[in-house]
Amino acid sequence: MSERIEAAYRRILQDLGEDPDREGLKDTPARAAKAMRFLTKGYQEDLDQVLNGAVFSSDNDEMVIVRNIELYSLCEHHLLPFIGRAHVAYLPDGKVIGLSKVARIVDMYARRLQIQENLTRQIALAVQQVTGGKGVAVYINARHLCMMMRGVEKQNSEMSTSVMLGDFRENPKTRNEFLQLIRTP
């Protein structure tokens, strides 16, 4: 597969009128193929692999929040990056997951061709599946280069998405507590 991706980048350079054998571009197809494999490595990962057994029994039933998880993904429409932060919360019901595993779940889904709306939902559903918690909340704010570098070229635009499951959806007080806590410095 790697050779095919590299050949495709070589062809793109040629179709742009470039010489892929010139000094500055000689290794570009291989580097671009390697970068694309890294940026989409989420396709090679699954939830069990990412968790690596880090699900623990716990009596805690209070909100757990992991804030400011940096993320980057590729827009599935233009293959251009979107870059932002995710805030993920859940209400445990007998189980908690390792702190780094929340960030790894975000990365697993972000490192695929995506739209932000689906990414937000996929993260929420995965955390719900793993924790079996009473609720999950995910809020993502991101800047999309497909909107900044092309099309309408709006440099300061940002997109926000949220998914609320369980108590976060059904209980406005719980939802508002989450939204307030993610804005607190």
UniProtKB/Swiss-Prot annotation:
Catalysed reactions listed for this entry: GTP + H2O = 7,8-dihydroneopterin 3'-triphosphate + formate + H(+)
Keyword GTP-binding among record annotations: yes
E.C. number(s) listed in UniProt: 3.5.4.16
Pfam families: GTP_cyclohydroI
Keywords: GTP-binding, Hydrolase, Metal-binding, Nucleotide-binding, One-carbon metabolism, Zinc
Gene3D superfamilies named in the record: 1.10.286.10, 3.30.1130.10
Enzyme class: hydrolase
Gene Ontology BP term (one): tetrahydrobiopterin biosynthetic process
Cellular component annotations (GO), alphabetically ordered: cytoplasm
Protein family membership: Belongs to the GTP cyclohydrolase I family.
Subunit structure and binding partners: Toroid-shaped homodecamer, composed of two pentamers of five dimers.
Protein name: GTP cyclohydrolase 1
Organism of origin: Alkalilimnicola ehrlichii (strain ATCC BAA-1101 / DSM 17681 / MLHE-1)
Gene: folE
